[in-house]
Curated annotation (Swiss-Prot):
Listed GO MF terms: ATP binding; protein serine kinase activity; protein serine/threonine kinase activity; signaling receptor activity
Active site residues of this protein: 1039 (proton acceptor)
Parts forming coiled coils: none
Cellular location(s): Cell membrane
Keyword Calcium: no
Keyword list, A-Z: ATP-binding, Brassinosteroid signaling pathway, Cell membrane, Glycoprotein, Kinase, Leucine-rich repeat, Membrane, Nucleotide-binding, Receptor, Repeat, Serine/threonine-protein kinase, Signal, Transferase, Transmembrane, Transmembrane helix
Lineage: Eukaryota, Viridiplantae, Streptophyta, Embryophyta, Tracheophyta
Stored SMART domains: S_TKc
Protein name listed in UniProt: Brassinosteroid LRR receptor kinase BRL3
LRR repeats: from-to residues: 103-127, 131-155, 156-177, 178-202, 204-228, 230-250, 252-276, 277-302, 303-325, 327-351, 353-375, 377-400, 401-427, 429-451, 452-476, 478-500, 502-525, 526-549, 550-572, 573-597, 599-621, 650-673, 689-712, 713-736, 738-760, 762-786
Entry binding sites for ATP: 919-927, 941, 987-989, 993-996, 1039-1044, 1057
Function recorded in the entry: May be involved in brassenosteroid (BR) perception in roots.
Signal peptide segment: 1-29
Length: 1214
């Protein structure tokens, strides 16, 4: 075969071929670049409606090679767009993904931190053959809504990372591509149960799953299918029920992070199995409703655990388990907000080898911190606040922890000299020192800052710190917060500290500071947000330099001796939310410029010497306020019920680290017996842009008319213009104050009528127009007729319920003035007499018809709003029949119930709820004596209107309380709802309250002998024991006191107001508020730390009542006890002056001082500072019964006990 000769191509041919290939690739690159540029521009045109920073201004239509790879946010590889990162560019518009999906090489898309919006469920796959190449997508922190993009997820089969967090997605959109490894859907509004179940059962390849901060409900499935998951975050949802028994034990071996914090899981975890947690490094089960004595022993199987958080469950109790020391890798331990008791074991100090953060705050721990904790050489954060720790361990133990950066010890009973010198010299890294509400004394060392250069927060409120505020604090250049309130400081504010560049909070209220306030604010820095220096003795003018503090949120200069005018420059402070200048001697006008403060929600100028008219511009911010700027501030509000002793609607305090029991001796409290204390955290938010919520201009000399523009402040809750010189009419525009709760216009010179539309102010709780010149009839709609007559008195032309009836002149002719002789006179007299008779008869018929029609309409209105208590029935209200029978309050407790009782009957029986029938008032409302037509007497309680309860919640609560019957509980006979009015009907107690009989002897005119007092003590204890141990569910009273112990004609004791504290919500929904449960003088020490109510708290309050019976003294009496109270006085006297404790009248009525001493011992046991050492009420009754053997009394003959319950043989008990 002949050989084939291969002829090599000429070099020129090869060059031509190579050139052709290059040209072909170049052409394709140019074409591809043009296509990708077109896709990006299409995306920009379709999705970017606003680009305020001009981030995409450089995107232009170009086909130049390298474009669009040089465009902002675009990254390329091999000339193709591989990544698009537009994060944080403030772009906005309705997102369209279609164009971007046309980029066939796009692997990573990052649009987080913009303002894109739209419904993601409408985003489909691109209309092309090539599949989606995306591997990583992050569109978090935008405003997307709707469900997940199902078609998008289906088309992107290679997607591995998907971040949809911080949007407003609601659910749907699964299944996910099997390639997915990381899924973050946190901080949305997801509630789809199917999505939750799929995420936890269809997660075969997912390694990271974050569903936190959504709205998922229901229970959890197991985790067995999630074989690869290592991070699972289900925190801050609405899930409930119990966890699967082996939820952790059967978890994947790869699981390292597990959080179910902030849900509503409720179960006993004492024996919970954690066996499968060998690789777990973080376990966060905080803020649920888990209960256990100690912690489950199986936790020691989690040997690699670095962070354990069981805080905020409130039901974990017993000693802190020492087996935790077996977790040898533990760096962060938080057991805060539970009920752990006892002392901190020194064995726990073994954890010091690794521990960096230890939080045991808000428990019931006692004793001291063991000395061995001084060896924690890695510990940086130590929080032992809100316990009952004592001793001087700060100086002896904590000062040895040189690594410490954050030290929080507020609300304990730690004593000793000021520990700051030792802390400063031995803990040089400290950034936060919080020693509030302890018993430290001494001065603040002048060289503090030279030893603590990193100090950011110095919090020493509510101690006994004396001396002056050292000017050397200005050397703490990193200082952000200074709180020295409620101490014994004197002298002036050193101007040097006002030059601190980072100072945000300066809080010095309730000291003895004096002099002029330095005019040196905000020259070097405008960081200051909180300036609260109220209730000192400052003089001079308000410094003009404060107007330079443009970031100021809370400014309080109240309760000083300031003079001069209010700076108009305050109107430039756009962040100012709370302005308190009340109780000074300020003069001049109210600056109209304050209306320019676009975030001002609280303005208190009461009790000054202001003159001029009220500027209508104050309402200019209505509809503009968002309110979020003041969120998170700790506050206390002392609400004044009434009276000139305490002017103004109330006092707002900055309340971080202040004990409520110390407020009891504060002048604003102990001078005002009707003042109640509310505490909480501000979370002012408005569904729409809101308005001011508190405005108090009372007790000034303001003149002119009331601005009608105030009616635009639809979120206004408190408006007090009383005690001024205002004239004119009440503006009809006030009917627009839909949220008003307290309106005081008293002691002015107002004329005209009360606007009829006031009957539509459904939240009105307190209304006072007394001492004006008003005329006309009080509107009968709404709740205006339910306020006492005192709120309308001294208005000579005002009439109607609850005042005297209005007299309508029907008009009648007069006698003729000219005489025409006897016959004409007689004839005319007869004619006039007949005419007058006819006119009078006709007028009477008209009046009768109008009254009949009025009462018919009123009956319909009342029928539409009343409900009856139906014990034993599931119905909480009933519909009217066609007969129109007046709706009744069912007297369920009587064996032979009274006939149907209507609201009209109660109104008539109390004479329109007039002052003459008022027999008592308290924190929950006013009580009236009502004598019914059949002779029966009942007590009618008109609840205060500050309530967040809806009809369903109120009715359910009343149905529960109405079924509780016991011989020593005041029975609820029925209730009535009329609009927002709530009336409760109780049995009438002839002898009133124990408080009245004991402490108002002049008016009560009765002395109680020991036998009667003993009878009252046992009866009230029996009633309280029934609530604690025999009611289902058990009831915590929350406000046990002598005024809630009522006495019948035989001086038998009845506990009243049980269940009421839970029913009442102190303020409206714009504040997250918890009313201080209890009354000053009766509040147990642990309530002053975390406001958590317990039966042992009731036991403490009962102990105070028992002391009142033994001593005859009031719980709080500054003239008797000074800064202390009855409990403190008795504990001082009981050691060696016991006989001086008893009421002298008792010594004359009892032959046995031993019995008095036995009852005193019971009282002291009830008043133990440690709740776990107090007896239960059953144990109190047992002790009483033991004493009875010697005393010969028969008060307890019908009382029996067993291990679990309390029963009585009386037929009245249930």
């Amino acid at each position: 075969m002949a050989a084939v000769r291969v002829v090599a191509p000429a070099p020129s041919v090869l060059l031509l071929v190579a050139a052709a290939v290059v040209l072909l690739h170049l052409a394709r690159a140019i074409a591809g670049a043009a296509d990708e540029a077109a896709a990006l521009l299409a995306f920009k045109d379709a999705s970017v409606a606003a680009d305020p920073g001009g981030a995409l201004a450089g995107w232009a239509n170009s086909t130049t090679p390298g474009s669009p790879c040089a465009w902002a946010g675009v990254s390329c590889a091999a000339g193709r767009v591989r990544a698009l990162d537009l994060s944080g560019m403030s772009l906005s518009g309705r997102l369209r993904l279609d164009a971007l999906l046309a980029l066939s090489a796009l692997r990573r898309l990052d649009l987080r931190g913009n303002a894109f919006h739209g419904d993601l469920s409408r985003h489909g796959s691109p209309r092309r053959a090539a599949p989606c190449a995306l591997v990583e997508v992050d569109i978090s922190s935008n405003t997307f809504n709707g469900t997940l993009p199902r078609a998008f997820l289906a088309s992107c089969g290679g997607l591995q990372t998907l971040n949809l967090s911080r949007n407003s997605l609601t659910g749907g959109g699964y299944p996910f591509p099997p390639s997915l490894r990381r899924l973050d859907m946190s901080r949305n509004q997801l509630s789809d149960a199917g999505l939750l179940n799929y995420s936890l059962t269809g997660c075969h390849g997912i390694q990271y799953l974050n569903l936190s901060a959504n709205q998922f409900t229901g229970s959890l499935p197991g985790l067995a299918p999630c074989t690869e998951v290592s991070v699972l975050d289900l925190s801050w949802n609405l899930m409930s029920g119990v966890l699967p028994p082996r939820f952790v034990a059967m978890a994947p071996a790869n699981l390292t992070y597990l959080s179910i914090a902030g849900n509503n899981f409720s179960m006993d975890i004492s024996d919970y199995e954690f066996g499968g947690c060998a690789n777990l490094t973080l376990l966060d089960w905080s803020y649920n409703r888990l209960r256990s004595t100690g912690l489950p022993r199986s936790l020691v199987d989690c040997r690699r655990l670095e962070a354990l958080d069981m805080s905020g469950n409130k039901l974990l109790s017993g000693p802190i388990p020492t087996f935790l020391v077996e977790l040898q890798a533990l760096r962060r331990l938080s057991l805060a907000g539970n009920r752990f008791t006892g002392e901190i074991s020194d064995k726990l100090s073994i954890l010091c080898k690794t521990l960096v953060e230890l939080d045991l705050s808000s428990n019931q721990l006692i004793g001291s911190l063991p000395a061995s904790f001084g060896q924690c050489r890695f510990l940086q954060v130590l929080d032992l606040g809100n316990n009952q720790l004592s001793g001087d361990f700060v100086e002896t133990v904590i000062t040895n922890i040189s690594s410490l950066r954050v030290l929080r010890l507020p609300f304990n009973n730690i004593t000793g000299a000021n520990p700051l010198p030792a802390l400063a010299s031995r803990c040089p890294l400290l950034e936060v020192i919080d020693l509030g509400s302890n018993e430290f004394d001494g001065e603040i060392m002048p060289d503090l800052c030279s030893s603590l250069p990193s100090l950011r927060k110095l919090l020493l409120p509510n101690n006994y710190i004396n001396g002056t505020v050292p000017s050397s604090l200005s050397n703490c250049v990193n200082l952000e917060s200074i709180d020295l309130s409620f101490n014994l400081l004197v002298g002036q504010i050193p101007p040097e500290i006002l030059f601190l560049l980072k100072l945000v909070d300066l809080v010095l209220w309730a000291n003895n500071l004096s002099g002029e306030i330095p005019d040196k604010f905000c020259f070097n820095s405008t960081a200051l947000e909180t300036l609260v220096i109220s209730y000192n003795s400052f003089t001079g003018n308000i410094p003009e330099s404060i107007t330079r503090c443009v970031n100021l949120i809370w400014l309080s200069l109240a309760g000083n001796n300031l003079t001069g005018s209010i700076p108009s420059g305050f109107g430039n402070l756009q962040n100012l939310a709370i302005l308190q200048l009340n109780k000074n001697s300020l003069s001049g006008k109210v600056p109209a410029e304050l209306g320019s403060c676009s975030n001002l929600i609280w303005l208190d100028l009461n009790s000054n010497e202001l003159t001029g008219t009220i500027p209508p511009q104050l309402a200019a911010q209505a509809g503009l306020i968002t309110g979020a700027i003041v969120s998170g501030k700790q506050f206390a509000f002392l609400r004044n019920e009434a009276g000139n002793i305490c002017p103004g609607a109330g006092v707002l305090f900055e309340f971080l680290d202040i004990r409520p029991d110390r407020l009891a001796n504060f002048p604003a409290v102990h001078l005002c017996s009707s003042t109640r204390i509310y505490t909480g955290t501000t979370v002012y938010t408005f569904r729409n842009n809101g308005s001011m919520i508190f405005l108090d201009l009372s007790y000034n000399s303001l003149t002119g008319t009331i601005p009608a523009s105030f009616g635009n402040m639809t979120y206004l809750e408190v408006l007090n213009l009383g005690h001024n010189e205002l004239t004119g009419a009440i503006p009809d525009a006030f009917t627009g104050l839909k949220g008003i709760g307290a309106l005081d216009l008293s002691h002015n010179h107002l004329t005209g009528v009360i606007p009829p539309g006031f009957g539509c102010l459904h939240f009105l709780a307190d209304f006072d127009v007394s001492n004006n010149n008003l005329t006309g009839e009080i509107p009968t709609s709404g709740q205006l007729i339910t306020f006492p007559a005192s709120r309308y008195e001294n208005n000579s032309g005002l009439c109607g319920i609850p005042l005297n009836p209005c007299v309508h002149n029907s008009g009648a002719g007069g006698l003729p003035q000219t005489s025409y002789g006897h016959r004409n006179f007689a004839r005319q007299s007869v004619f006039l007499a007949v005419t007058l008779s006819v006119l009078i008869l006709f007028s009477l018929l008209i009046i009768h018809y109008k009254l009949w029609k009025f009462h018919k309409n009123k009956t319909k209105e009342i029928q539409a709003g009343c409900s009856e208590s139906l014990p034993g029935s599931s119905k909480s209200s009933w519909k009217l029949s066609g007969i129109g029978e007046p709706l009744s309050i069912n007297m369920a407790i009587f064996e032979n119930p009274l006939r149907k009782l209507t609201f009209s009957d109660l109104h008539q029986a109390t004479n329109g709820f007039c002052a003459e029938t008022l027999i008592g008032s308290g924190g929950f409302g006013e009580v009236y004596k009502a004598k019914l037509k059949d002779g029966n007497i009942v007590a009618v309680k008109k609840l205060m209107h500050f309530t967040g309860q809806g009809d369903r919640e109120f009715t359910a609560e009343m149905e529960t309380i109405g079924k509780i019957k016991h011989r020593n509980l005041v029975p609820l006979l029925g209730y009535c709802k009329i609009g927002d009015e709530r009336l409760l009907v109780y049995e009438y107690m002839k002898n009133g309250s124990l408080d009245f009989v004991l402490h108002d002897k002049g008016e009560a005119n009765m002395d109680l002998n020991w036998a009667t007092r003993k009878k009252i003590a046992i009866g009230s204890a029996r009633g309280l024991a029934f609530l604690h141990h025999s009611c289902v569910p058990h009831i915590i009273h929350r406000d046990m006191k002598s005024s809630n112990v009522l006495l019948d004609g035989n001086f038998d004791a009845y506990v009243s107001d049980f269940g009421m504290a839970r029913l009442m919500n102190a303020l409206d929904s714009h504040l997250t508020v918890s009313m201080l449960s209890g009354t000053p003088g009766y509040v147990p020490p642990e309530y002053c730390q975390d406001f958590r109510c317990t039966t042992k708290g009731d036991v403490y309050s009962y102990g105070v009542v028992l002391l009142e019976l033994l001593t005859g003294k009031k719980p709080i009496d500054p003239t008797e006890f000074g800064d202390s109270n009855l409990v403190g006085w008795v504990k001082q006297m009981v050691e060696d002056r016991c006989s001086e404790i008893y009421d002298p009248t008792l010594m004359a009525t009892t032959s046995s001082e031993l019995e008095l001493y036995q009852y005193l011992k019971i009282a002291c046991r009830c008043l133990d500072d440690q709740p776990n050492r107090r007896p239960t009420m059953i144990q109190v009754m047992t002790m009483f019964k033991e004493f009875q053997v010697d005393s010969g009394s028969n008060f307890l003959d019908d009382f029996s006990l067993n291990s679990t319950n309390m029963e009585e043989s009386s037929e009245k008990s249930v």
